[in-house]
Amino acid sequence: MECYEQSRQRAAFVVLLFIVMLGSQAQAQLRTDFYSDSCPSLLPTVRRVVQREVAKERRIAASLLRLFFHDCFVNGCDASILLDDTRSFLGEKTAGPNNNSVRGYEVIDAIKSRVERLCPGVVSCADILAITARDSVLLMGGRGWSVKLGRRDSITASFSTANSGVLPPPTSTLDNLINLFRANGLSPRDMVALSGAHTIGQARCVTFRSRIYNSTNIDLSFALSRRRSCPAATGSGDNNAAILDLRTPEKFDGSYFMQLVNHRGLLTSDQVLFNGGSTDSIVVSYSRSVQAFYRDFVAAMIKMGDISPLTGSNGQIRRSCRRPN
């Protein structure tokens, strides 16, 4: 009996080791020079389009960054969020966390069109999302990084998964945030650093109404200023947008964390990062050192880009980001 139990434990260990090796192998296939021979002009081509779009509308930088996040947290960084509905599946665009909220699809289409003309059938939509996220941060004054590439695109999307709570709602508690990020291999420090993306961008009234009218851990003058464009009545001004960082809304810096220390986080999921909990010290450190924030944000973005990529012969290189081949 004891011998059988030992054999069973060894078998379970071998299976676990195999799974870990498969995950490591997939990540190992991602590399920064993946397209250096097959599409050498990829990076400057993407940069030019993102630069043009950010020049037209600064807000689009935050939208492109968020698009990558919402893709990676639903079955991995596989560009499933870009797929339109088909007869065989309902896509993720109209799921609760994305509907009337996630933007930037047309920018990805424009980039894909240009890249296809240069290097047909070579570059995945998933990799384009990763590059545009990096370029958006850079163009708003943040620190860049070398993007690991080699992802392939999914051939399906999942409305139900996108709606299942894997994407943190704006009313999240700290425990909920920690658990959701941990499920994707991201630490509490990674979570706080990635939340710093809210140093740019805007949120709709419907996502922060409860906070500005009902919260007690909020600066009163801040709450009053936000109420001017966000009426208390549900259905009134739901889509009115407010900037997330009052101080430097168009600069990727550490101001977001200074706002949290002063109880001026716009979303509940922002302020819970500094509310007497386990992440308070991280917020304080970022509020005092933008370089510490930049360092950890870059590391967390690279880790997020490693979430369950399709590599090798898995998935496909879509000709259009909106539909499978």
From Swiss-Prot:
SS bond list: C39-C119, C72-C77, C125-C321, C205-C230
Active site, UniProt feature: H70 (proton acceptor)
Record lineage: Eukaryota, Viridiplantae, Streptophyta, Embryophyta, Tracheophyta
GO BP terms: hydrogen peroxide catabolic process; response to oxidative stress
Annotated SUPFAM superfamilies: Heme-dependent peroxidases
Anything else known: There are 73 peroxidase genes in A.thaliana.
Glycosylation sites: N99, N214
The protein's required cofactors: heme b; Ca(2+)
Modified residues (Pyrrolidone carboxylic acid): Q29
Protein name, UniProt field: Peroxidase 68
InterPro entries referenced in this protein's UniProt entry, alphabetically: Haem_peroxidase, Haem_peroxidase_sf, Peroxidase_pln, Peroxidases_AS, Peroxidases_heam-ligand_BS, Secretory_peroxidase
Keyword Kinase tagged: no
Protein EC: 1.11.1.7
This protein's encoding gene: PER68
Free-text remark on how the cofactor is bound: Binds 1 heme b (iron(II)-protoporphyrin IX) group per subunit.
Sequence positions that bind substrate: P168
Top-rank lineage group of the source organism: Eukaryota
